Amino acid sequence: MADYFYVHKKILPDYLEKVLEAREMLDSREAATVTEATERVGISRNTYYRYKDYVFRAKDPARGQQAVLSLLLADLPGALSAVLTCVTDHRASVLTISQAIPLASHASVLMSLDLAGLKGDINTLLADLKSLPFVKNLQLAGLE
C-alpha cells in the first residue's frame, strides 16, 4: 500500500475522473466500446488506456459492502416477507437470516446483507425498513 495515496479530486486533473466515468460506463454496459465511452466523457482513448489501471474511487465508508441488522418485528403474517421485499427493492441481498420464536407478540430477527448492488445508500434502506408498520425496532449492528 506504500505506492498509493488518498487525495481529494479537487487537486487532480479533470481527465482522471473522466477515466473513471468511462470505465463505469463500460462496466454498466452504458457504453459498448472504449471508443464510445471515451467520446461520451470527452477524453482520448490514449488517456483512458494510460490511466485506467491506476485510478480508482475510494470506498465510501457509509457505503460498506456488508451490513448486519437487528430487527424486532410484530408477530403478524407477512411481517418478515415485507422486510425481505423492502431489502430486495433496494437491491441488497440477504446473506444470512435468523428469526427467534415470537415472544410477547414480537419476533427478533438478525439479518446480514450484501450491499454490493445497493440502490441508494444504507440510510435510505434503514429509513424505509423503519417505516414498515411491522418493524417495531431496527438497529444497524454492523457495517463493513
Swiss-Prot record:
Residues 68-143 form the ACT domain. It comes from the Bacteria. SUPFAM superfamilies: ACT-like. InterPro entries: ACT-like_dom_sf, ACT_dom, UPF0735_ACT_dom-cont. PROSITE patterns: ACT. Belongs to the UPF0735 family. NCBIfam families: PRK04435.1. This is UPF0735 ACT domain-containing protein Ldb1351. It comes from Lactobacillus delbrueckii subsp. bulgaricus (strain ATCC 11842 / DSM 20081 / BCRC 10696 / JCM 1002 / NBRC 13953 / NCIMB 11778 / NCTC 12712 / WDCM 00102 / Lb 14).
